[in-house]
């Protein structure tokens, strides 16, 4: 949510910054709503002042024993008018808030302008894709040959975009998440959390999934309940960030560095026909999520740090990747600045996103009403989040980049302790 004060005082500046995202701010609606709000505010305050004056006159008349019947009639009529004005103001304020919630975050000045992923800027590359002396297979073919990935059974159980993993492939998937958790807790200073896998609508509003992106979620409505509505989490960013919702934090407690390993659930409503093969785009997938809560002046440095923490996973796994600075048109709704990490997938002969690390500024903090206490006042925190990493896509990268000519998969050295020293995945465990 944008700063309402800046939106009112500098609407043209806000419009120019949003235009860099190819978002058109409806200035006429903004001005109309603001003018109407001011008028109703003045009207309501005048009616309240008159009511207070009449109440004082009634009290004074009672003391003097005067006939105050006419004053009672007037104050009752005034109450009806005031109630109507207050209701009208409340309805308008709801519309104003809905309008404000529909606005994306303002991009940082360092973010390049562009319409889509073709305009993103490559910052650096690490590692070189291997040169194979044999035709490299994709992860689907590898997984099926090793009988470790079963998409047919998953389709019978739940439909498309699900998978059943078994044997050493399932163990490799688990080893990846354990390795990531250990790295981020032991070396990078994150506190691990276990969080709910479904959340209420207030939480989704706080991090920006609602009201705009409701169709991307799997919603849960308990039978016989009209008010208890939930959704499965699309990312652990939602429960982790909302742990500080409606709180005033001590400045000395910042930064907060939180982490969770959870399944993530996404409807992929806008992805029909895209990545229908394999593990790249699933309705359910595991992810290790990193979240930081910082002071405003520290958030850009924290973004570099958080992104480096995600990069460490790829480096230790010796997976080639590149770091991309997203352009204004490709950033997420609530992001101020975003880096994507794209890992090389030998089966697709291309780089694919495996982590997205974003500085949200105070966008989420305003929605959640999360502040920290300074010596002079309470200020909104800045929030950051990033994947450290998406476990399924990391599994894909390991399978495709560590495949051997005989169809086996070499287990990366850093993962072998998590797999009882196993060096190669050759066939399914009995």
Swiss-Prot record:
Binding-site residues, L-serine: 235-237, 289, 387
Enzymatic reactions: tRNA(Ser) + L-serine + ATP = L-seryl-tRNA(Ser) + AMP + diphosphate + H(+); tRNA(Sec) + L-serine + ATP = L-seryl-tRNA(Sec) + AMP + diphosphate + H(+)
Enzyme Commission number: 6.1.1.11
Example GO BP: selenocysteine biosynthetic process
Subcellular location field: Cytoplasm
GO molecular function, one term: ATP binding
Pathways involved: Aminoacyl-tRNA biosynthesis; selenocysteinyl-tRNA(Sec) biosynthesis; L-seryl-tRNA(Sec) from L-serine and tRNA(Sec): step 1/1
Subunit text: Homodimer. The tRNA molecule binds across the dimer.
Entry domain remark: Consists of two distinct domains, a catalytic core and a N-terminal extension that is involved in tRNA binding.
Family: Belongs to the class-II aminoacyl-tRNA synthetase family. Type-1 seryl-tRNA synthetase subfamily.
HAMAP family reported in the protein's UniProt record: Ser_tRNA_synth_type1 (MF_00176)
The name this protein goes by in its record: Serine--tRNA ligase
Organism: Hamiltonella defensa subsp. Acyrthosiphon pisum (strain 5AT)
Gene giving rise to this polypeptide: serS
